[in-house]
Structure formats: C-alpha cells, structure tokens
C-alpha cells in the first residue's frame, strides 16, 4: 500500500487532533476529581477564617477600600501597597502562590513557627488551632495559584516605591 504525502499529512493531523482531545479530557477529569475530593465544609471554614481573621485586609488588593467587596478571584493574591516603619518596608505576601508550593503539613508547621515583620500579626497565626490552619490551607488551595509575587522587603535605610503607609517610630 502506498500513501501519498497528502494522505500521510492528514493521518498525522488526525493523530495529533485525537491526542490533543484525549489530553484535554484527562485534564478535565483530573480537575473534576480534585474538586470532588475537596471537603467543601472545610473550604467554607477556611473562607470564613480568612474573612474574620483579617487575612484579606492586607493580602487582598483593594479589600479595605472596597469594604470587603473585592471579588474572591483576587483574594489573597498579595499587594504592592507597602507598610513602612522602623523595620523597613514590608509587603503582603501572595498567599496563593506561597501556599501552592507547600504541602498541608508544611503550611501548618510554617504557620505555627512564623516570625514576621510588622504589620503581620504572626503571633495570631502561631496561636491558631491546627484544624483552623488546615481549613485555611484548603481554602487557599481551592482558590488556586494566581497573581504575581509581592515586592521584596525594603530595608529601613532605603526609600521604597510608593504607595506605602508610614508608621511612626515608637516613643522612646
């Protein structure tokens, strides 16, 4: 049997098209399976904790100014608004990128031992119950990785790019 170039090209195109479809079906099935294995009660608990715990106040761009009406798709993606004080200038971490690189146990360990610069209330995170930390992790993972990394820390002797809030030095 002899196949001319046109028939051979069609055969290759058909194989590629079928392969592409099979890969997309497998991806869709894996995504559906991931969603079906998520315990939505735990995710909802994490959503609640991120709201009442104040996580969004800093880690979600525009959250405070919108009175909490920022779309959830932007939640916990960090911010380029800096917090400047005697410690330097810090920026709210993109928690969705950060958490996507950790296992649940790594997140719990990190949250329990974190020591961060102001204004992050790391001591409150350290004090959270393990089941609440796990719920917060599940919620952040449910949101999925998105956004860009926050700007890097700026030492006290360097001028940060605006915008930033300036904290006064404590009284002596």
Where are these regions (language model features)?
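Bacterial N-terminal signal peptides that target proteins for export
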Residues: 2-15
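Bacterial N-terminal signal peptides
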Residues: 12-24
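Signal peptide processing junction and immediate N-terminal pro/mature segment
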Residues: 25-32
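Flexible coil segments in periplasmic/lumen-exposed cytochrome c-class electron-transfer proteins
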Residues: 32-41, 52, 60-90, 118, ...
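Local sequence-structure signature of Cys/Sec-based thiol-disulfide redox active-site neighborhoods
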Residues: 47-53
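Mid-chain, structured segments of secreted extracytoplasmic proteins
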Residues: 82-108
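A structural feature that tracks compact, well-ordered secondary-structure segments
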Residues: 96-100, 109-114, 122-125
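An amphipathic alpha-helix signature
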Residues: 104-112, 130, 134-137
């Amino acid at each position: 049997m002899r196949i001319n170039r046109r028939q051979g090209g069609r055969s290759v195109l058909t194989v590629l098209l079928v392969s592409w479809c099979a890969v997309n079906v497998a991806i869709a099935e894996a995504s559906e399976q991931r969603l079906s294995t998520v315990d939505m009660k735990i995710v909802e608990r994490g959503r609640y904790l991120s709201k009442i715990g104040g996580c969004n106040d800093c880690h979600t761009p525009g959250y405070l100014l919108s009175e909490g009406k920022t779309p959830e798709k932007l939640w916990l993606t960090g911010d380029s608004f800096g917090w400047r004080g005697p410690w330097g200038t810090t920026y709210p971490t993109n928690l969705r990128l950060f958490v996507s690189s950790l296992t649940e146990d790594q997140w719990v360990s990190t949250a329990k031992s974190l020591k961060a610069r102001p204004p992050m209330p790391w001591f409150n995170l350290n004090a959270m119950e393990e089941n609440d930390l796990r719920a917060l992790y599940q919620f952040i993972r449910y949101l999925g990785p998105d956004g860009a990394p926050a700007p890097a820390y700026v030492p006290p002797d360097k001028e940060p790019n605006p915008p930033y809030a300036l904290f006064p030095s404590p009284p002596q």
